[in-house]
Protein backbone atom coordinates (compact mmCIF):
# COMPACT_ATOMS: atom_id res chain seq x y z
CA UNK A 1 0.00 0.00 0.00
CA UNK A 2 2.30 2.72 -1.17
CA UNK A 3 1.26 6.09 -2.55
CA UNK A 4 1.73 5.11 -6.19
CA UNK A 5 -0.40 1.97 -5.80
CA UNK A 6 -3.18 3.85 -4.04
CA UNK A 7 -3.01 6.65 -6.62
CA UNK A 8 -3.44 4.11 -9.38
CA UNK A 9 -6.38 2.42 -7.66
CA UNK A 10 -8.21 5.66 -6.99
CA UNK A 11 -7.43 7.20 -10.38
CA UNK A 12 -8.75 4.16 -12.21
CA UNK A 13 -11.94 3.70 -10.20
CA UNK A 14 -15.18 5.61 -9.80
CA UNK A 15 -15.44 7.38 -6.45
CA UNK A 16 -19.14 6.53 -6.33
CA UNK A 17 -18.22 2.86 -5.95
CA UNK A 18 -14.69 2.67 -4.58
CA UNK A 19 -13.43 4.28 -1.41
CA UNK A 20 -10.32 3.80 0.68
CA UNK A 21 -9.78 1.96 3.96
CA UNK A 22 -6.95 4.15 5.25
CA UNK A 23 -4.46 2.37 7.51
CA UNK A 24 -1.71 4.54 8.98
CA UNK A 25 0.32 1.48 10.01
CA UNK A 26 0.29 0.02 6.52
CA UNK A 27 1.40 3.30 4.93
CA UNK A 28 4.23 3.60 7.46
CA UNK A 29 5.20 -0.05 6.95
CA UNK A 30 5.46 0.74 3.21
CA UNK A 31 7.85 3.62 4.03
CA UNK A 32 5.26 6.27 3.27
CA UNK A 33 4.29 9.23 5.46
CA UNK A 34 0.87 8.32 6.90
CA UNK A 35 0.02 11.97 7.63
CA UNK A 36 0.71 12.94 4.02
CA UNK A 37 -1.40 9.98 2.88
CA UNK A 38 -4.45 10.81 4.99
CA UNK A 39 -4.34 14.44 3.87
CA UNK A 40 -4.13 13.38 0.24
CA UNK A 41 -6.86 10.76 0.36
CA UNK A 42 -9.34 12.08 2.94
CA UNK A 43 -12.06 12.76 0.32
CA UNK A 44 -12.02 9.05 -0.63
CA UNK A 45 -11.62 7.58 2.87
CA UNK A 46 -14.63 5.68 4.19
CA UNK A 47 -12.98 3.64 6.93
CA UNK A 48 -9.90 4.15 9.11
CA UNK A 49 -7.62 1.62 10.79
CA UNK A 50 -5.37 3.05 13.48
CA UNK A 51 -2.28 1.19 14.53
CA UNK A 52 1.33 2.02 15.30
CA UNK A 53 4.54 0.37 14.13
CA UNK A 54 7.60 -0.82 16.06
CA UNK A 55 10.61 0.34 14.05
CA UNK A 56 12.98 -2.28 15.46
CA UNK A 57 10.78 -5.09 14.12
CA UNK A 58 10.08 -3.25 10.85
CA UNK A 59 13.84 -2.91 10.32
CA UNK A 60 14.32 -6.62 11.01
CA UNK A 61 11.59 -7.50 8.49
CA UNK A 62 13.30 -5.34 5.86
CA UNK A 63 16.86 -6.55 6.58
CA UNK A 64 15.91 -10.23 6.69
CA UNK A 65 13.49 -9.93 3.76
CA UNK A 66 10.68 -11.38 5.87
CA UNK A 67 7.08 -11.46 4.71
CA UNK A 68 4.39 -9.08 5.90
CA UNK A 69 2.78 -11.96 7.82
CA UNK A 70 6.07 -12.81 9.52
CA UNK A 71 6.35 -9.18 10.59
CA UNK A 72 2.85 -9.27 12.03
CA UNK A 73 3.67 -12.44 13.97
CA UNK A 74 6.84 -10.81 15.32
CA UNK A 75 4.77 -7.90 16.64
CA UNK A 76 5.55 -5.12 14.17
CA UNK A 77 2.17 -3.52 14.86
CA UNK A 78 0.84 -2.14 18.13
CA UNK A 79 -1.80 0.29 19.35
CA UNK A 80 -1.52 4.02 18.60
CA UNK A 81 1.04 5.71 20.82
CA UNK A 82 3.01 2.55 21.61
CA UNK A 83 5.12 2.53 18.45
CA UNK A 84 7.32 4.77 16.39
CA UNK A 85 5.01 6.67 14.04
CA UNK A 86 6.20 10.11 15.12
CA UNK A 87 3.25 12.02 13.68
CA UNK A 88 0.50 9.76 15.07
CA UNK A 89 -0.85 12.60 17.22
CA UNK A 90 -1.02 14.85 14.16
CA UNK A 91 -2.89 12.14 12.25
CA UNK A 92 -5.49 11.91 15.01
CA UNK A 93 -5.85 15.68 15.23
CA UNK A 94 -6.28 15.87 11.47
CA UNK A 95 -9.04 13.25 11.53
CA UNK A 96 -10.88 15.27 14.17
CA UNK A 97 -10.44 18.58 12.30
CA UNK A 98 -11.92 17.01 9.17
CA UNK A 99 -15.08 16.09 11.11
CA UNK A 100 -14.69 12.52 9.88
CA UNK A 101 -17.72 10.50 11.01
CA UNK A 102 -17.04 7.07 9.55
CA UNK A 103 -15.74 3.95 11.23
CA UNK A 104 -12.41 4.03 13.08
CA UNK A 105 -10.94 0.71 14.17
CA UNK A 106 -8.00 0.46 16.57
CA UNK A 107 -5.76 -2.46 15.68
CA UNK A 108 -2.87 -4.02 17.50
CA UNK A 109 -2.38 -7.37 15.73
CA UNK A 110 -0.28 -8.72 18.58
CA UNK A 111 0.14 -12.01 20.38
CA UNK A 112 -2.25 -11.82 23.33
CA UNK A 113 0.10 -14.03 25.36
CA UNK A 114 2.75 -11.30 25.08
CA UNK A 115 0.63 -8.13 25.00
CA UNK A 116 -2.39 -8.14 27.32
CA UNK A 117 -5.34 -7.10 25.12
CA UNK A 118 -7.07 -5.11 27.87
CA UNK A 119 -3.93 -3.17 28.78
CA UNK A 120 -3.16 -2.39 25.15
CA UNK A 121 -6.75 -1.39 24.40
CA UNK A 122 -6.60 0.98 27.38
CA UNK A 123 -3.24 2.37 26.24
CA UNK A 124 -4.58 3.00 22.73
CA UNK A 125 -7.77 4.58 24.07
CA UNK A 126 -5.84 6.97 26.31
CA UNK A 127 -3.50 8.06 23.50
CA UNK A 128 -6.34 8.60 21.04
CA UNK A 129 -8.42 10.53 23.55
CA UNK A 130 -5.40 12.71 24.42
CA UNK A 131 -5.19 13.86 20.79
CA UNK A 132 -8.84 13.83 19.80
CA UNK A 133 -10.59 14.59 23.09
CA UNK A 134 -13.77 12.85 21.99
CA UNK A 135 -14.67 10.74 25.02
Q: Which residue stretches match the model-derived regions?
A:
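Histidine-acidic metal/acid-base catalytic patches
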Residues: 3-19, 26-135
Amino acid sequence: ENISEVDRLLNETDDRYVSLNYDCGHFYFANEDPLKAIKKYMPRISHIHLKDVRDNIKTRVEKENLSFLQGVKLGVFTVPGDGDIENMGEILSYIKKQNYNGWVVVEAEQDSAVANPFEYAKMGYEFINKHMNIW
